[in-house]
Amino acid sequence: MAAIQGIEGGISQLQATAMAANGQETHSQSTVSFAGQLHAALDRISDRQTAARVQAEKFTLGEPGIALNDVMADMQKASVSMQMGIQVRNKLVAAYQEVMSMQV
């Protein structure tokens, strides 16, 4: 989480610098933070994986009303969500490294 806060701080500094260069005043925004959005996305990925695992366990135990095609679809949704999360993380790390390597 420290890396996420570092990225958020860097982005805020860049935005303040860009606004100052354009002659605009900097003011705090009351919108949701980048870190908050990232945390919410990670929670949704985790929830989707948990739901798929629970449904697979119910199917394995033979509970009625749980079809194999529903289990497989939910498992694929969870897998795609995780892969997307990993790709977003990789892009964020690459962007952070690029920003940190810039000369001021």
UniProtKB/Swiss-Prot annotation:
Gene Ontology terms, MF aspect: cytoskeletal motor activity; structural molecule activity
One GO CC term on file: bacterial-type flagellum basal body
Keyword Transcription included in the entry's annotation: no
Disulfide bonds: none
Gene Ontology biological process terms in this record: bacterial-type flagellum-dependent cell motility
Keywords: Bacterial flagellum
Location relative to the cell: Bacterial flagellum basal body
InterPro entries noted in UniProt: FliE
Keyword Ribonucleoprotein attached: no
Family as reported in the entry's similarity comment: Belongs to the FliE family.
HAMAP family linked to this entry: FliE
Protein name per UniProt: Flagellar hook-basal body complex protein FliE
The organism of origin for this protein: Salmonella typhi
